[in-house]
Design a protein with these regions (language model features):
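Extracellular structured ligand-interaction cores
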Residues: 121, 179-181, 195, 234, ...
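Extracytoplasmic low-complexity segments
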Residues: 445-519, 543-551, 557-565, 633-634, ...
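Extracellular, beta-strand-rich glycan-interacting domains
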Residues: 463-472, 532-542, 606, 652-681
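Extracellular/periplasmic catalytic domains that process cell-envelope and extracellular macromolecules
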Residues: 36-38, 69, 175-178, 187-191, ...
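Conserved beta-alpha junction segments in alpha/beta enzyme cores
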Residues: 1-78, 82-236, 242-253, 257-268, ...
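Short, solvent-exposed loop/turn and secondary-structure capping segments
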Residues: 87-90, 136-137, 249-252, 397, ...
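Flexible glycan-contacting loops in extracellular carbohydrate-active proteins
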Residues: 628-658
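Extracellular glycan-interaction surfaces
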Residues: 487-518, 535-544, 568-634, 649
């Protein structure tokens, strides 16, 4: 159903500040697919809009129910998230279109009505293909010496969306990418295409308004590819938005493209991928359908009294106009949020189509959360449709709140509690368990056998072994069996790609690693004396000329003690050993041992440190020859249990980059063991 506005100009959604459009570049649509297994009938619908509020979609569902009989809790309606469509609600600095808002629910309902009228015998199938080259993390971590100021005047921005291409102020992505392009295809029993639902985690491309962006162009181009342009009833293609809260098409680690990205060209590439993938789909004449929904109560983050006072003072200076700056904009948001209830009911859904699972969340969801839902779901494959059945703003994973940025700034578009994302995951997984009748996956045991590297480490019987595959903190799980779990401290981004060699992972999953952005991991290891070893993989992101010490990888010593008594392994900076490994035993003894090899940044390296009494030896990248070798007294108190990963025991010069596969031994590893461990990983890509 065509839902392009009938009257122009209109206010356009998706920007911090107000913008309008008086031209329609391409048509907007509400597209619907209705499925029926003779027991359950469900409607899946996408709307070419940025966000659609729950009251609007509830109104559309009621109208559709009255026309079709489909229960309102068997309808999944989502916004595509084009940033070139009319606003349906006032967010940030955007204006409103009350006439368009009143007109739209009936048009959405009409899409459900027409799809229901076109029900016919069909077969269904699904598949998933990977498209990692077309979506990337758009939220990047800033250098520790270049932290930015938020609209409230606080120096808090360690991560931000859209850093710009190869911006030297930024280090690397703050989150993982979900590269899956999921496809559900419906055909007649004879093989004529009827409809297709795709799902991809990519925010939008960008198009001049009014436009459906690539979501609409994808539907048009796929219709042409399957050669059913004039079919009756017409073929309907839907592109739903996955968990793209922090994902976009730009790869900010590369040079800026010579030509701007066209939403039409982008849609063509994705449509061709889908078209090719459909050739290998196995179809089923019947599959069971099941759908459940719930509402999850989530708190609105409270405003502090000082911020509210400051907001009132600032908004008084522009009472007769719209905000023009970010401080003005967010001041107005604080006033508006101070007047809303302290809790929201967030709608969630789960849909089963045979062995396929679909989750629906009414928020802007980060890629990590989508990957977590996929990993835990009892149904395989599973994908998530965001901005479904309402709009409740960004829900960053909890660790991202410590890094700041506009997806964490308190506004109507980002106001839910810090723990919202894991609570959503838990509720959605419970719904998927209900519709499937199966328990969630645990990500351990025989379903996920270990690769050669972790097997080699475990065979050497470490006192502690942290693989750092966690989706979230605060617990860093010790996989040695010795119960030396660690604690992730704030300033860490989770679940990015770790050392990529197959030996480091298991046969089913990418090896994962956290990015340390000012945070560290601390743990207590019982039974350590002055003879012990530590090994790990690391990938430094901070330039070696940024500060006196580039960053500490490992530290053993009492926490927070002045002078940092202990063993400290790191990468030198401008003070000494620039870009090379160094060992330091604290300010009292001041023994510094420095390696010879310059450590290339943004590449994975393996390091092992062995203390045997006064002798300290460090090995790099599996070499039998020591990188560092010398005598250094232990300055930590006897039998010190405290160890730190990614930082020093006094918090000085914490590491900036990724660390993975950390093992500590209560004995000296031999050079031969270290070399064999490194070899077990295989060839590691940068």
């Amino acid at each position: 159903i065509d839902i392009a506005p009938r009257e122009l100009p209109v206010h356009i959604a998706g920007s911090f500040f107000a913008q309008t459009a008086d031209t329609i570049q391409d048509r907007l649509h509400a597209r619907c697919l209705v499925l029926d297994d003779e027991v359950t009938r469900v409607a899946i619908l996408t709307v070419d809009t940025c966000v659609a509020t729950q009251d609007l979609l509830d109104e559309a569902k009621l109208l559709a129910h009255q026309a079709t009989g489909i229960p309102v809790d068997r309808m999944l309606m989502s916004a595509t998230h084009t940033h070139a469509a009319p606003t349906l609600t006032s967010l940030l600095g955007s204006g409103e279109n009350p006439g368009y808002r009143r007109w739209l629910p009936a048009q959405i309902a009409q899409a459900v009505t027409e799809a229901t009228a076109n029900l016919a015998p069909a077969r269904i199938g699904w598949t998933v293909v990977r498209a990692p080259e077309h979506t990337h993390c758009r939220r990047w971590i800033r250098r520790p010496d270049r932290i930015d100021t938020d609209p409230f005047g606080r120096l808090s921005v360690r991560a931000m969306m859209h850093p710009g291409y190869q911006n030297p102020d930024y280090l690397g992505p703050a989150g993982p990418v979900d590269p899956d392009l999921s496809i559900v295809s419906v055909q007649s029993p004879e093989g004529r295409p009827i409809g297709l639902l795709a799902n991809y985690s990519m925010h939008y491309v960008g198009a001049p308004p009014v436009s459906a962006d690539y979501f609409g162009s994808f539907a048009d181009q796929l219709t042409t590819l399957v050669n059913v342009q004039n079919a009756e009833p017409p073929f309907v293609a839907l592109m739903s938005n996955g968990t793209s809260g922090d994902l976009h098409w730009m790869d900010y680690g590369e040079a800026k493209p010579a030509q701007p990205q066209s939403h039409i060209a982008y849609a063509e590439v994705i449509a061709r991928k889908v078209f090719q993938a459909c050739k290998d789909i196995a179809y089923h004449n019947w599959v069971p359908l099941a759908m459940r929904e719930t509402t999850l109560p989530l708190r609105v983050r409270p405003i502090c009294a000082d911020d509210l006072t400051n907001a009132r003072e600032l908004t008084a200076t522009f009472a007769d106009r719209l905000p023009r700056t970010l401080p003005e904009l967010y001041a107005r948001e604080q006033i508006q949020l101070s007047q809303v209830p302290p809790e929201r009911e967030v709608p969630l859904q789960a849909l089963r189509i045979g062995e396929l699972g679909i989750a629906a969340v009414s928020c802007e969801v980060f890629g990590l959360t989508g990957l977590q839902i996929k990993a835990l779901s009892p149904l395989a494959p599973t994908f998530t449709i965001e901005l479904a059945n309402g709009y409740h703003g960004y829900i960053p994973p909890p660790a991202q709140h410590a890094l700041g940025g506009y997806t964490t700034w308190r506004a109507r578009s980002a106001c839910l509690e810090v723990e919202a994302a894991p609570k959503v995951v838990e509720a959605v997984i419970h719904l998927l368990e209900t519709v499937s009748g199966q328990p969630r996956r645990t990500l351990t045991g025989d379903d996920y056998p270990l690769g050669d590297y972790p097997r080699a480490v475990l065979a050497s019987k470490p006192a502690a072994y942290w693989r750092f595959n966690e989706f979230e903190g605060p617990r860093a799980t010790d996989e040695s069996g010795n119960r030396h779990d660690g604690v992730f401290n704030p300033g860490i981004a989770f679940y990015l790609e770790g050392p990529s060699a197959r030996g480091n992972a298991n046969v089913h999953r990418i090896n994962r690693a956290p990015h340390f952005a000012g945070g560290s991991v601390n743990a207590h290891i019982t039974g350590l004396n002055d003879t012990y070893s530590v090994e790990m993989w690391f990938k430094d992101y901070l330039p070696a000329d940024a500060r006196p010490v580039t960053g500490y990888l490992f530290s053993r010593g009492p926490a927070g003690v002045q002078g940092a008594p202990g063993d400290h392994l790191g990468i030198g900076g401008t003070a000494t050993g620039q870009g090379r490994l160094l060992f330091y035993n604290g300010d009292a003894l001041k023994m510094t041992l420095v390696g010879d090899t310059e450590i290339p940044a943004k590449a994975w390296h393996h390091v092992a440190m062995v203390r045997a009494g006064r002798q300290v030896t460090v090995y790099l990248n599996g070499s039998m020859l020591a990188e560092i070798e010398g005598q250094a007294e232990a300055s930590y108190p006897p039998a010190t249990e405290q160890v730190f990963i990614g930082g020093r025991n006094d918090g000085f010069a914490n590491f900036e980059g990724r660390i993975d596969e950390v093992a500590i031994y209560d004995r000296p590893l031999s050079a031969d063991e270290i070399t064999k461990h490194h070899a077990a990983a295989g060839a590691v890509e940068p």
